[in-house]
Swiss-Prot record:
The keyword Transport applies. GO terms for molecular function: SNARE binding. The modification N-acetylmethionine is found at M1. This is Syndetin. Residues 1-25, 532-563 are annotated as: Disordered. It comes from Rattus norvegicus. GO terms for biological process: endocytic recycling; protein transport. There is a cross-link at K963 (Glycyl lysine isopeptide (Lys-Gly) (interchain with G-Cter in SUMO2)). GO terms for cellular component: EARP complex; membrane; perinuclear region of cytoplasm; recycling endosome. Keywords: Acetylation, Coiled coil, Endosome, Isopeptide bond, Membrane, Phosphoprotein, Protein transport, Transport, Ubl conjugation. Its main location: other. Acts as a component of the EARP complex that is involved in endocytic recycling. The EARP complex associates with Rab4-positive endosomes and promotes recycling of internalized transferrin receptor (TFRC) to the plasma membrane. Within the EARP complex, required to tether the complex to recycling endosomes. Not involved in retrograde transport from early and late endosomes to the trans-Golgi network (TGN).
Length: 964
């Protein structure tokens, strides 16, 4: 029944997974015979009905556990038996038995073909095995016959042949041993010729051959000798490798690398090479410094050789410091150049080997070579930083071994130049920013520069106090680029000047120092200073250069050596400095020079010797900043102090006048006042002597300040004949404006080196200080304008005029002629001054503007002093003023006349009604309380009554109250 159940399960029957047991209890459940199978299959059937019958069989009949079926069925009987129900149940069991029997019969018949086929396969396998046994038996029999007939007869022949082969091999071995005994002579010759690869190749081959014959007693001694020779070769190879560090030779290094590759020690060679480079750096710097120390000591004392490098550096004298530093950098350059060329060699050979490997070779060998190549590459790249770090530390030790504060400025600049060049080498060598060198030289530079700047400020104060403000005669085409201190700007234009031109300028890769000096030379060779060979052609024979001299210079085309090269071309881009390709003909240039003669003469720069010294000082500061960019902010800060102090001195000498601010004319802008206050607080030491009770912090702050300068006693500013020192005022003020223009010109260069975080300081300096230079013109020239014309005399003349006339006058008053005469005299004296010093048009305009404005305000003040005035008197005022304007316009080209409306509006206000005048008073606050009050009082009785007068005076008082 278990098999029946399993067959039913494989057929996908849903009957419970249990088997029928103990079928003997029911005869009706016996397995049908073949006849019954046939009958069952012949009976018509409904598969679905049969499946339902099978599914209706109780679970217990499929159970694998044995149980009593009869007992089970009897226990199921009800207490009261019903025959009909029993028969129905019995029929049901019979139907279930028939369905199961039929299903079993179907399954058996279905599997019968497979059973027959498998039985046939087993029978065929049995037949094949029997045939194989027969073949094996026959084979064994034939093998025994062959063994007895052939093997024993051939053994003698084989033994003789073997003996022959052994003897031949012995003969070859003896010959090889003989050759090996003679190789030591050849090895010595190859070592003397420095043919290391050949020697190693021969030695390795001998060792390989010797290992083959190690069973011979005579070989052991030879093998030991070859091993000693190989070790000797390695020692000589290491010495040869060390020579690479100072003088790289391609052929020599190629032999050494081939030798190490034959030894299989490529990685070891690279480790040794870096040790040699480190040792070479130490030995090189020590020997260079030791040589200078012993030379300066003047004796052969050996105590210096026992000193540490750090202690040895402290014995270098100031005189030999720069040559020693240059030689030190030159020697270190040779070491770094050798390393650079070593890397070049490996890059070249790696590419060649890669190309050869791509053509096909041993895969294992290629992988090993690639591994070695990768190791060497990483080692070399890592070594760049290590070697540069060693170089930095050695140079840093040397730099800190001597106090640089005692050096002259040019010597210190030279030291910075060498260190800057060394940092450039470091950047090209390994991309390093040389933080160690930068920090060491930055601290020394700032300390040096602070002391240097303090001395320069004191010198500037001395120059200013001794300056007589005479014109320094420079040529009309003067440019600061013609000064030696600014030559470096022409050699290396700032990249920020022309950002749009950068791609084209850098389209070709710049040549590095290693590429430039790879074949020879040294970037640290001390070059002679060529400044003395060049002469600055900036000074003229006098302030203007005589007309004959200049005209002849312009007429003679060949005598244009003083004209900058840029001016000879078509045009120069002011932003980029680039010159177009288009050329200019000789005729065009000649005509242009003639036409520009007067223009150049008019535009000749106005500056003093002190101005020129400040400009030169700025150039020197920029040289230091250009060489050592990390201190750019400090240098620019000190440069700004030079300008601040110059500006403050000009203001103190010529523009300080408390009465100016009381005029309320806004002569000094709030920006200018803020700038002057800032300079006074941060830079000017207002205390005459040091206060012993001052704190240490205050003393340090005062140390950074400079006393306020005093005007030279030779400069007379009180003489009316010279227009109260107008010539000196013009030279001083316009020299400041010129200095500001030069700072504007230098702004792109300063901006290019200024750190990004500090650029707001530079922008603030230019917007709040440099740009205010021209604003000093107003207060300085106002003092001249206030004294050049006798305004008090005009007021006295106006008080003598009778303004309450009853008829309209046709003749103007005398004070107008007196005032015009004063202006004519002023114009005459102005022309006299212009013969000494060129007065620029903006200065002339400011002077005339100040004088006219003061005159007009004096006229209004005179009208405000009038006690009584009629309508005809007001008409006379208008007549006087119109006459004054008409004559004044012939003396000056200023249009419109300053404060013209200020007078006219005041005169016309006399005719206003009460309401209009009240509104007019509130709208015109530019008039003083006295002037407004007088206007109301004069109008009393004519068209304003007392009540209206009180109202208007109250309005004036309301306006004046906030001013108190």
């Amino acid at each position: 029944m278990q098999k029946i159940k399993s067959l039913m399960t494989r057929q996908g029957l849903k009957s419970p997974p249990e088997s029928l047991n103990d079928l003997g209890a029911f005869e009706s459940l016996r397995v049908p015979g073949k006849e019954e199978f046939r009958e069952l299959r012949e009976q018509p059937s409904d598969p679905q009905a049969e499946q339902e019958l099978i599914n209706s069989i109780e679970q217990v009949y499929f159970s694998a556990d044995p149980f009593d079926i009869v007992k089970y069925e009897l226990e199921k009987l009800p207490p009261v038996l019903n025959l009909q129900e029993l028969e129905e149940y019995r029929d049901k069991l019979k139907q279930q038995q028939a369905a199961v029997s039929k299903k079993v019969a179907d399954l058996i018949l279905e599997k019968q073909p497979a059973y027959v086929k498998e039985l046939e396969r087993v029978t065929s396998l049995q037949t094949g095995l029997q045939l194989a046994a027969v073949i094996c038996t026959n084979s064994r029999r034939h093998l025994n016959i062959a063994k007895e007939g052939f093997t024993q007869a051939s053994l003698g022949l084989l033994a003789n042949q073997r003996k022959r082969q052994l003897l031949i091999g012995l003969l070859k071995s003896l010959r090889t041993i003989k050759t090996l005994q003679r190789t030591d002579v050849r090895l010595s010759e190859m070592l003397e010729e420095e043919d290391y690869p050949g020697a190693i190749q021969l030695c390795l081959e001998c060792q390989k051959a010797a290992s083959t014959f190690k069973h011979y007693s005579c070989i052991s001694e030879l093998n030991s000798k070859l091993q000693d020779t190989l070790e000797q070769i390695e020692e000589q190879l290491d010495v040869a490798l060390s020579k690479i560090c100072k003088n790289f030779d391609v052929n020599h290094y190629t032999k050494v690398q081939q030798a190490y590759r034959l030894l299989g020690k490529t990685q070891t060679a690279m480790d040794q090479l870096h040790m040699h480079f480190t040792q070479a750096i130490h030995n090189t710097v020590f020997q260079v410094v030791l040589g200078y120390v012993e030379l300066c000591a003047g004796n052969t004392d050996t105590k210096f050789q026992k000193l540490q490098y750090k202690d040895l550096c402290t014995h270098v004298t100031p005189d030999s410091y720069i040559p020693c530093l240059a030689d030190l950098c030159k020697a270190l350059w040779e070491v770094m150049l050798s390393y650079y060329r070593t890397m070049e060699w490996h890059e070249k050979h790696d590419s060649e080997e890669t190309a050869a490997a791509s053509e096909g070779s041993n895969v294992m060998s290629t992988e090993e070579t690639n591994f070695d190549r990768g190791y060497v590459k990483k080692k070399l790249e890592h070594g760049l930083t290590r070697i540069w770090q060693d170089v930095q530390l050695k140079v840093k030790t040397y730099l800190l071994g001597t106090d640089l504060s005692i050096f002259k400025y040019d010597d210190f600049i030279f030291v910075l130049d060498i260190v800057s060049r060394l940092m450039q080498v470091g950047e090209e060598f390994c991309g390093s920013k040389s933080e160690v060198l930068q920090e060491s030289i930055r601290k020394q530079s700032i300390n040096y520069f602070k002391n240097h700047h303090r001395i320069r400020l004191d010198e500037l104060r001395m120059f200013l106090e001794n300056e007589t403000w005479e014109l320094c005669p420079v040529k009309s085409n003067f440019s600061i680029l013609q000064l030696h201190e600014f030559k470096f700007l022409e050699q290396s234009r700032s990249p920020s000047v022309s950002p749009s031109k950068q791609p084209s300028a850098t389209s070709s890769k710049p040549v590095t120092l290693f590429e430039q000096y790879c074949s020879g030379g040294n970037p640290f060779e001390i070059q002679a200073d060529h400044k003395d060979e060049e002469t600055e052609d900036v000074l003229a024979s006098n302030g203007y250069e005589s007309d004959e001299q200049e005209k002849s210079a312009y007429q003679d085309y060949d005598s244009d050596s003083d004209v900058p090269e840029e001016l000879k071309r078509d045009y120069v881009d002011e932003q980029t400095g680039d010159v177009p390709v288009k050329s200019v003909s000789r005729e065009t240039l000649k005509s242009r020079k003639k036409s520009d003669y007067s223009l150049n003469k008019v535009n000749a720069p106005i500056l003093t010797n002190t101005t020129l010294n400040v400009i030169r000082l700025v150039g020197k500061y920029m040289q230091m900043m250009n060489i050592l960019k990390p201190i750019a902010f400090d240098v620019i800060h000190f440069m700004s102090q030079l300008f601040d102090y110059y500006l403050y001195a000009i203001y103190t000498f010529f523009g300080r006048n408390d009465s100016l601010e009381s005029t309320g004319l806004g002569l000094s802008s709030s920006r200018l006042r803020t700038t002057l206050n800032r300079i006074q607080e941060s830079l000017i030491d207002l205390e005459g002597s040091a206060d012993p009770t001052a704190t240490l912090t205050a003393a340090e702050e005062r140390k950074e300040k400079v006393p306020s300068p005093h005007l030279n006693q030779l400069v007379i500013l009180t003489s009316g004949d010279t227009l109260y020192g107008l010539a000196e005022r013009v030279v001083a003020t316009e020299s400041l404006v010129f200095l500001a223009e030069q700072f504007e010109f230098l702004q792109p260069h300063l901006d290019a080196v200024m750190p990004a975080v500090k650029k707001p300081f530079l922008q603030q300096f230019y917007s709040q200080t440099v740009s205010t230079a021209s604003e000093l013109r107003k207060p300085i020239y106002w003092i001249v304008a206030g004294k050049a014309i006798d305004y008090e005399q005009m007021l006295l003349l106006m008080t003598n005029v009778k303004w309450d006339v009853k008829e309209i006058m046709s003749q103007h008053n005398v004070y107008v002629d007196a005032l015009l005469k004063e202006f004519e005299q002023f114009n005459k004296r102005l022309n006299e001054v212009s013969k000494r010093v060129r007065i620029p048009l903006p200065v002339s305009n400011i002077l005339w503007e100040h004088c006219i404005r003061l005159a007009n305000r004096t006229i209004v003040e005179g009208y405000a002093n009038v006690k009584k005035c009629s309508n005809e008197g007001r008409a006379l005022m208008q007549l006087d003023f119109q006459q004054f304007l008409m004559k004044l316009e012939k003396l000056t080209d200023i249009r419109p006349i300053p404060d013209k409306e200020f007078v006219e509006i005041y005169i016309k206000a006399y005719y206003l009604t009460e309401n209009d005048m009240e509104r007019w008073i509130k709208e015109h606050r530019e008039y003083s309380t006295k002037q407004l009050t007088n206007l109301v009082n004069v109008c009393l009785g004519s068209h304003i009554n007392k009540k209206a007068r009180q109202k208007l005076l109250a309005a004036i008082d309301d306006i004046d109250r906030p001013k108190r």
